[in-house]
Structures are given as structure tokens and as C-alpha cells.
């Protein structure tokens, strides 16, 4: 079941992708216009999704393939108690690897790196400074304080987050990970008690989006 979504980079859509060890399923949760969508499928199914930023029409593009047998649920205005979180150390290594080799990379990944150059790296001048001072890591949980990093950006441009998402998605593709997930989301504020069920190899980030067009 292939899908292609284009969103206007102006409003907010919250999304979360995580693996539930309790249910033994990969779960995608989205919130659009106060409506919550949940997609669940078995762990032995391949999910191939990629996020990129289209500079020409200022849109965020999400493309991918879901298994044919996919459970989709919908609930309106469901109250949820939530907290911020982000991923652990591998993300820093992935990003550093691509930045160091950006002169030999082309296509969407090249565009993502150029976006990072424009919106983040040039702000600090030194990528090590960016990592050490801005990507704070909680030593107990191993989670990045990524939300504060985004808020600290001078321009707070959603494109940097989309660029980071693209890099991580592409890394999973190149390393032939079977359970590839979307590297999405204004860190979909996950319910705190579910933290123990999360697979910390899942990536959470923050984007801005608006009207969905399937």
C-alpha cells in the first residue's frame, strides 16, 4: 500500500513512530486538526518511508509503503497526558557521518545537508560545538533534549528538522534495516508511562505541516 503525502510547511502536525514491545507492533500515531490517527502493523512487515523538504514549493513530502494488512484507527479530541522526549547517541553519529561526507553525496540527502548548512551549522561555525553544546544528552535515559535545541535555533525553521529526519531515514535505508520507521515529528509528545516500551532506536523529531493531500 503505497502513499504519497504533501504538506504545506506552515502549520503543525504532530506524529510519533515507535515500536511497542507490549503489543509487539510498530505504531504510527498522527494528530491532524484535533483528530488522532493510529496505524499499527506487525514487526515482521517492512515500512519504507522517507521525508524530504521541497525548496521549490515550500512543502514537506512524505513517501512510503505500508503493508497491505494494516490496522488504522481514528479518534477525535482524545485527551492525552504527554511529555517530551527524543532519541539517543546513534543520531549524533549518523548526522556527523553525513556532514563529513556531504561533498560526495547527491540527491535528497545533499539537499538536506545544504539545509543544515544554511540553518544550523553556519550559526555555530563548528559542528563539534553544535553537538557538544546544543545536542544535550540525558545520561540516565540517553535521550536528546532536541526540542530545546530547535527552540534555540535563531530562525527556528522547520526545514532543519525535516533535513535531520531525511538523514536518519536515509541512513536506515542504506544500512538495510528491515524495520525502517519514519523519522518524523514535533516529537509527538508521548504518554510518559509508555516510555519503558519504546525501542530507543526509533527517531523522533519536529516538523511543521498543514493540509494533508494523499
Swiss-Prot record:
- Where on the tree of life does the source sit, at the highest rank? Viruses
The record ties this protein, via InterPro entries, to: Poxvirus_Bcl-2-like, Poxvirus_sf
Q: What induces it?
A: Expressed in the early phase of the viral replicative cycle.
In the UniProt record, does the keyword Metal-binding occur?
A: no
Q: Which GO terms describe its biological process?
A: symbiont-mediated suppression of host cytoplasmic pattern recognition receptor signaling pathway via inhibition of IRF3 activity; symbiont-mediated suppression of host NF-kappaB cascade
Task: List the keywords (alphabetical).
Answer: Early protein, Host-virus interaction, Inhibition of host innate immune response by virus, Inhibition of host IRF3 by virus, Inhibition of host NF-kappa-B by virus, Inhibition of host RLR pathway by virus, Viral immunoevasion
**In which family does this protein belong, per the annotation?**
Belongs to the orthopoxvirus OPG176 family.
What this chain does, per the entry, is described as: BCL2-like protein which disrupts the host immune response by inhibiting the TLR4 signaling pathway leading to NF-kappa-B activation. Acts close to the plasma membrane and targets several host TIR-domain containing adapter proteins including MYD88, TIRAP, TRIF and TICAM2. In turn, blocks the host NF-kappa-B and TRIF-mediated IRF3 activation.
The protein's assembly and partners:
Tetramer. Interacts with host MYD88, TRF4, TICAM2 and MAL.
Name listed for the protein in its UniProt record: Protein OPG176
The protein's gene is named OPG176
